[in-house]
Amino acid sequence: MACSEVIYADDGALKGVVAGEFGKNADGTPGDGYEPGMELHGKYVFLSEGVRGSLAKEVIAKYNLSANCDVPKFGIGMKEIWEVKPENHNQGEVTHTMGWPLGFKNSGGSFIYHLENNRVYVGYIVDLKYKNPYLFPYMEFQRLKHHQKIAKVLEGGKRIAYGARAVTKGG
């Protein structure tokens, strides 16, 4: 459920969020079928909006949370879900890599998670600070899957889902 507003206590402390507000017009006014959101208050409030989080930006500005911090860093993350042959599956196995096939001038890494039902999640994240205009993160992901250890896991399997998104890397 998306959150549309941050709630502050009288003393200025972060108190909660408004969630589940639906039916606003493009200009922000209530439209036909408008449903107000529900206030959710908590002792702790976690904002997990991703790289374009408008509520997080508001909170960062209000409390000056970016003072003395590095500039934000971003990456592009790609993930595929595979159904693999049982003999290629090891439920619970986790593999993280870094570097290859990107080379020394670029940074990124991969993950391979063996979940239940012969499902394997394969993902690759490339930092968006690369200088080579010809670097194509999607093709680097394809190269990664041809590594002998990864290809062996995926051999005879079937990709059943995929996606990509921008990810925060620090800052």
Residue ranges and their predicted role:
Residues V153-G171:
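A glycine-rich dinucleotide-binding beta-alpha-beta segment and adjacent secondary-structure elements
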